[in-house]
Amino acid sequence: MKIAINQPAFMPWPGYLDRIARVDHFVMMDAVQFERGSFINRNRIKTQHGAHWFTVPVKLKGHTQNRICDVPIDDTRRWQENHAKQILHAYSRALRFGENSKALELMYGCKHETIAHLCCHWLSFWLVEYAITTPWSLMPRTFTVPGKTEQIIEICQALKADGYLAGPLSRDYLDLGKMEKSGIAVEFHDYTPPVYPQLWGPFIPGLSILDMWMNTETNPWRES
């Protein structure tokens, strides 16, 4: 069985979903430390001014050493209203804005205590939208070993996985020798996003899946 492991990501780019679609099981790594400036609570959409960050505010005071699954969302910032305005301005002319607006309204109307819960909710939504049937689960809440490679090995062994589809950035830290010694074959997921029609000028890759969802009816995973 081949698995993939990734931290939660708010409205992730298409490559996040592509990696999930190519494995037998996906594990969301939410019991590790929250990283400032990551994609856990933000991503980019395309506006008339180019790529633009939209962010879910979180309460980090007193939580900087806490796990992602423990970091609360800051609902005092009225972020749902801000996102609604940003999405309206960016995508009101998009091909699928009309048919997708109600789903967005329903999703944004749900309340979540933590950023991990929010990311889980959105992940379930995107998997259904794009007919990706890969089962997924949250990571174990405790580790018996330190180190990134060792943690990955432990998760693989817990799931009896003999294959691991790694993200390209894991080349910087993944110990391939330890993985091989543990009987886990490693592949790297080098993803090239599809080019699709966008508003506001030349194509910009690497945006949130929201951009592709709004601009095209194409499902690259159903058609691959």
Language model segments and positions:
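Residues lining hydrophobic/aromatic ligand-binding pockets adjacent to catalytic sites
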Residues: 1-224
